[in-house]
């Protein structure tokens, strides 16, 4: 298996990415969250010139954040800085959309978007809608070497639900999943293979990546130790953020756990968090407070909700032997790469996870 990192994107992400490269990681994936993080292409550009081997991926690009030629140009420009090391991940948007008060981007529109971007990267001239008008667009002089469309840029799609998995197969793209639970990861991997076959594609030709959010516990360490809470508390609260808006946008947890609390033992926490959420103002833009620090830090008023049970249930945390066993089962389920989040300020996670991975 390959192993990668993903990270909320600071402008100087290259420092974390270089550390991951030196530790033997294969990939680094950058979040496209425009009101929380630095610009994804700025950060990836710096990482491209500061690293030598590690592959750099958009994790993931949200179509509504930039028009087709801008996205294609960004990827082709990165490809000029790091030829053959750029990966193009796309998705309907979670954090980047929720944090501006929007639900997921339409799957049908994402299909057209990905087709157009990849068409431009092949040197073709797709027709797209710009300001309601159909226009043919393409790179006018790629032969100058200002960008690089000679080296292929593999495409992957974040597909947590059945419609996006069908789209992934239709476009013959690699697949990005999230490790919500072992049952979810195994079941969705089987479905992804079925979708590839239904689309006339060979599942073995496509890579399956799984983003896993967890901490490496020391022997005897509590799930709510200060160290663990710093590393994965922001992951646990992400699920609380998600549940508060599930009625409007659906839930990350919906496919395998329904909306609301994913475990009966957490119902009280979810109820109390809703009371906190409903206290946020302005009432028509509670998302402005709800998503502050999303996947980066726990806000002061959220701290009391980050319990050992919440972390144990909602994150992929465990001791090194436990995590190695889980990773082996992910490999058996068909995954080619495990990607772990490095929480800002907790870059030591790179070294902790590297020690887990080197024995797998």
Q: What does each model-identified segment do?
A:
Residues 64-77, 104:
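Glycine-rich anion/phosphate-binding loops
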Residues 7-12, 32-39, 63-69, 182-186, ...:
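Acidic-and-aromatic substrate-binding clefts and catalytic sites of carbohydrate-active enzymes
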Residues 1-58, 153, 343:
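N-terminal beta1-alpha1-beta2 module of alpha/beta enzyme domains
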Residues 1-11, 61-69, 149-160, 214-218, ...:
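Active-site mouth loops of central-metabolism enzymes
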Residues 9-20, 74, 159-167, 319-329:
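Short, acidic/polar
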Residues 3-7, 28-30, 56-59, 86-90, ...:
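Hydrophobic faces of well-ordered beta-strands that scaffold small-molecule active sites
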Residues 24, 47, 78, 117, ...:
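Conserved, mostly hydrophobic/aromatic
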Residues 103-144, 190-332:
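An alpha-helical appendage that flanks or caps ligand/catalytic pockets
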């Amino acid at each position: 298996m390959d192993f990668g990192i993903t990270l909320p994107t600071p402008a100087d992400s290259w420092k974390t990415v270089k550390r991951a490269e030196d530790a033997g990681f294969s990939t680094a994936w950058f979040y496209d969250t425009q009101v929380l993080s630095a610009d994804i292409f700025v950060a990836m550009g710096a990482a491209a010139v500061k690293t030598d081997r590690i592959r750099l991926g958009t994790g993931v690009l949200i179509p509504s954040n930039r028009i087709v030629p801008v996205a294609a140009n960004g990827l082709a420009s990165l490809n000029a800085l790091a030829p053959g090391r750029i990966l193009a991940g796309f998705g309907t948007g979670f954090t980047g959309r929720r944090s501006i008060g929007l639900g997921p981007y339409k799957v049908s529109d994402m299909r057209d978007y990905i087709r157009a971007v990849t068409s431009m990267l092949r040197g073709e001239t797709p027709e797209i809608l710009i300001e309601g008008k159909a226009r043919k667009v393409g790179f006018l002089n790629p032969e100058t070497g200002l960008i690089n469309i000679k080296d292929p840029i593999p495409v992957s799609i974040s597909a947590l639900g059945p419609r996006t998995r069908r789209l992934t197969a239709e476009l013959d793209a690699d697949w990005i999943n999230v490790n919500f639970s072992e049952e979810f990861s195994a079941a969705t991997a089987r479905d992804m293979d079925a979708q590839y076959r239904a689309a006339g594609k060979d599942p073995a030709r496509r890579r399956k990546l799984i983003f896993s959010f967890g901490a490496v516990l020391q022997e005897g360490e509590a799930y709510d130790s200060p160290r663990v809470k710093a590393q994965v508390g922001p992951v646990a609260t992400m699920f609380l953020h998600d549940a508060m808006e599930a009625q409007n946008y659906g839930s990350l947890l919906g496919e395998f756990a329904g909306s609301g609390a994913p475990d009966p033992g957490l119902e009280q926490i979810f109820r109390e968090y809703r009371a906190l959420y409903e206290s946020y103002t302005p009432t028509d833009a509670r998302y402005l407070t709800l998503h502050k620090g999303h996947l980066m830090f726990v806000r002061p008023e959220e701290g009391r909700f980050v319990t050992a049970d919440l972390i144990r249930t909602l994150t992929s945390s465990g001791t090194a032997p436990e995590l190695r066993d889980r990773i082996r089962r992910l490999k058996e389920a068909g995954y080619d790469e495990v990607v772990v989040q490095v929480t800002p300020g907790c870059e030591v996670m790179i070294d902790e996870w590297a020690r887990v991975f080197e024995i797998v």
